[in-house]
A protein has these predicted regions:
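N-terminal active-site segment of His-dependent metallophosphoesterases
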Residues: 1-54, 67-69, 118-123, 270, ...
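Active-site neighborhood of phospho(di)ester-bond hydrolases with catalytic His/Asp-centered motifs
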Residues: 1-2, 31-36, 58-64, 77-79, ...
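Active-site-proximal beta-strand elements of phosphoester/diester hydrolases
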Residues: 1-8, 87-95, 152-154, 212-217
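Active-site environment of divalent metal-dependent phosphoester hydrolases
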Residues: 6-10, 38-44, 65-71, 83, ...
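Short amphipathic alpha-helices and their capping/turn segments at secondary-structure boundaries
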Residues: 20-23, 74-87, 91, 136-149
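Conserved beta-sheet core of the metallophosphoesterase superfamily
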Residues: 52, 59, 86-89, 160-245
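Active-site-proximal loop/helix segment associated with metal-binding centers of metalloenzymes
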Residues: 91-148, 157-169, 241, 247-254
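A short C-terminal boundary segment appended to hydrolase-like catalytic domains
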Residues: 133-137, 237-280
Length: 280
């Protein structure tokens, strides 16, 4: 799973119990969360994980939201973890971006967009974005060279251009989503499966040059399938600007009908955001 955004989604007792029940029902032996648990790793994410791991073994890697308030050294301690399940190894790390998904704009233009619009302007990274990505790629290749057997990779950022924004307004933000260079390494070292998130769109699993990609982030509640479906089932609550996700969610979030609807359909939403991989 990825992109639970516990704070933004107000993950309370009901949501946590629904998640625990789903994992048990699906027979999950190990849960990995590929970043963006919350905006506060220490006070929100780690206590959540500590409670959850009393019921199921789990691991995680950082997303950009998890990095808020962390030093570069603290960020690095969570990177490049390797776990073994049978013959299969799970490699987890955050990833990053180098603007290469939007090559037509200059570095200065990307920095202006980032400063004006993007969450990561709040982070205190030690190096610039292309340098962070280059360092990450070097570390990743050095690690992959040492591994044999089937490899699963979990990262937060987007490793292939097929998953980018296609809407003209949002295309400039593709610069901050990831880098195709990750995919090239996955192909080179015959990585079997890759799970990632960051961009809150869910895709069917697909194989690209021998690598099977899984992108099923939970995302923000305003983006959830159950939120969209609520308006179809209760059209009287539709607003004129339905394309504005914040506004349409604000119009329903306090409705008794929506609270009941969410309770009824939350399990299905969580299940749709779960990627299950059977290992050798």
């Amino acid at each position: 799973m990825s992109d639970l955004h516990l704070d933004s989604n107000q993950f309370g007792d009901f949501e946590r119990q629904a998640l625990r029940h789903l994992l048990k029902e699906e027979g999950i032996d190990h849960l990995h969360i590929a970043g963006d648990l919350s905006n506060d790793l220490t006070k929100i994410s780690l206590p959540f994980l500590e409670t959850l791991k009393q019921e199921i073994p789990l691991s995680f890697n950082l997303g950009n939201h998890d990095m808020l308030g962390l030093s570069e050294q603290e960020i690095s301690t969570y990177d490049f973890q390797v776990q073994q399940f049978g013959q299969t190894k799970l490699v987890s790390f955050s990833g990053w971006y180098d603007y290469s998904f939007v090559p037509e704009k200059s570095k200065e233009e990307h920095l202006r967009t980032k400063t004006n619009f993007w969450f990561d302007r709040r982070l205190e990274r030690q190096f610039d974005d292309p340098s962070i990505t280059a360092q990450t790629l070097r570390k990743l290749e050095k690690l992959l060279m040492t591994l044999d057997g089937p490899i699963i990779v979990a990262l937060h950022f987007v490793p292939h251009q097929d998953f980018l924004y296609d809407h003209p307004y949002f295309q400039r933000f593709n610069a901050f989503l990831g880098s195709q260079a990750f995919h090239r390494l996955f192909v080179k070292y015959r990585v079997k499966e890759v799970v990632f998130g960051h961009l809150h769109h869910r895709h069917q699993s697909r194989i690209i040059e021998g690598v099977r990609y899984h992108m099923r982030p939970l995302g923000y509640i305003r983006e959830w399938e159950l939120t969209r479906n609520f308006f179809n089932d209760f059209p009287q609550y539709k607003i004129p600007q339905m394309y504005r996700l914040h506004k349409r969610y604000n119009a329903l979030k306090d409705l008794v009908e929506f609270r009941d609807y969410k309770k009824k359909h939350l399990a299905a939403e969580l299940r749709d955001a779960l990627t299950v991989i059977e290992v050798q």
